[in-house]
Regions:
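Short, charged helix-capping/linker segments at alpha-helix termini
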Residues: 7-16, 26-44
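A short, glycine- and basic residue-enriched loop/turn
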Residues: 11, 39, 53-59, 63
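Hydrophobic/aromatic residues within well-ordered alpha-helical segments
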Residues: 17-21, 25, 70
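Structural recognition of an alpha-helix C-terminal capping motif at a helix-to-coil junction
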Residues: 40-47, 60-72
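Short acidic-aromatic loop segments in the C-terminal HATPase_c
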Residues: 50
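Arg/Lys-rich amphipathic alpha helix in sigma70-family domain 2
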Residues: 54-57, 71-81
């Protein structure tokens, strides 16, 4: 599983996760923030996911976990505006 490889430090596996989910995350974030800011907020979500990947326990699907991170980053963006 890609997530397990990332948890073991495999950078290429994380790149594959980004490629796999970047459009879904961008689409999700675009519901909350102006289109011009979507790439920045999506990048922040992926950075947060990378830094916190060790806390992913697999109790849910990876995208469910990433979805929550992306929504939280969008909300943080909105509060800051």
């Amino acid at each position: 599983m890609l997530v397990e490889k990332v948890q073991l430090g495999d950078q290429k596996a994380f790149n594959l996760l980004v490629i796999r989910y970047q459009h879904k995350v961008a689409s999700l974030i675009s519901r909350y923030v102006p289109q011009g800011d979507v790439p920045d907020v999506a990048q922040e979500a992926f950075i947060k996911a990378y830094r916190a990947i060790g806390s992913f326990r697999g109790d849910s699907e990876f995208y469910t976990w990433l979805y929550r991170i992306a929504v939280n980053k969008a909300n943080i963006y909105l509060v800051a505006q």
